């Protein structure tokens, strides 16, 4: 599998993966918005044939902090290392720009994601009440590297 920068031609694949993988609904334009915010923080995971199977979209919060806004891997490829490779690539891009902290939010009920992030250096930093559209809380997680 190959990690590369987001291309406009990836938009339909990203939207499909997000719609099938994430609890919240997002308009396709959200990917363009994040790309304009921080182009280096938009990565996709591709198979050798070019098919997109995962993505990570992030924003630069300040000179030393980035925030993962959306992160999803097609359910068929979960557990394959695709998510880890995407996160490692984001950390590398962030490090090259002087960023040393990445933050994110995750549902407390998404134990698989919470465990994934913990095993990759993220630690809980609080609970955000009424964070999601359905009123559900989020765990704020931080990784310093």
What are these regions (language model features)?
Residues 79-92, 115-119:
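Conserved acetyl-CoA-binding loop-helix of GNAT-fold acetyltransferases
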Residues 103-105, 118, 123-140:
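Conserved catalytic-core motifs of GNAT/GCN5-like acyltransferases
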Residues 5-76, 87-89, 93, 97, ...:
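Acetyl-CoA-dependent GNAT
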Residues 87, 110-113, 130-135:
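Short glycine/proline-centered loop/turn elements that form peptide/ligand docking sites
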Residues 1-3:
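Extreme N-terminal starter segment of soluble prokaryotic enzymes
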Residues 74, 78, 105-109:
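Residue-level recognition of the GNAT/N-acetyltransferase active site
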Residues 50, 54, 81-83, 121:
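Conserved phosphate-binding and hydrolysis motifs of nucleotide-dependent enzymes
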